[in-house]
């Protein structure tokens, strides 16, 4: 999960490049081009825009071209269109990136560094061939490349792994970087991560007992590059459909129990012992964690396959006698990388949610009836709910992960 920061901010304050991600493990920072940075990149009184990139960090809201020139510097010998995504858990000053192919047969896949041990044998023992790009696996250090400046205005790539060698188009020194195209209008917007102060404030509680669910408040916002999400389509098509997914964390109150007092005008018993406290007994079964795919209940699978994905699959209802399982109306499963799932869980645990244990918890408590509430008519008990929502660039809600804090209850009287 990534927060976003503006390019102009890093140009003004170079020291901020060395700052660790404020979000903790399994997180990173995306650099987006703002109006101020775009103005700086113009000349001829704003009539023309510079396409050549000469400094780091690299923006993530644009497809970039890695351009190799001939010895004269006038003719292009090769051009690769790529997307540079900062490596997780690294400051931007490390200049470590996942290099994603944005065009051709490997579109959507990430460059892989070759290993010295993989040098050819037989006739050409000293030749190290480029490895084919593969889907991203954040655990694979050979898919991380460090970009270095060369002679101020050009670049070259180097493997982070000691025995690794990047693909030739990155390894060769002196290539230029040019802006190919912007991702507008589906480029990442401002996403500042978790707002701890707003989260601790909790949603307003001034609503009637008839309210089943209060209005929600967004307390966190991130972006997730498409390599960490799997849909039922090719990487090439997925990259074209949604290069970045928006993740939000919302808070709201949800009613788990309510009752009415039918004897509101006759509830004071003159013969009642003053030492005996009247209470409302709350009894409710609460599902602590629930998942949804496109609005339908889903189950989360275990980590599996290349990249360590958890698959969220819609729950299909039970079949009747002799009835075939219906496929109609069931959406395709959605996969989330383990880094996204673990980051969400850490955010929850930092907010007081306790993982593990039973999925369904029995809530039982006695709520005392104060003297000022002796004429109450309706009572409701609410649990604090925090919900992660993952949306495509077109706004479609793909996955929703709901966490109920059974230790954060509030009661409402009327």
Language-model-detected regions and their locations in the chain:
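Membrane-permeabilization and membrane-interfacing ectodomains
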Residues: 208-414
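Lectin-like carbohydrate-binding module/patch detector with strong preference for beta-trefoil
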Residues: 2-227
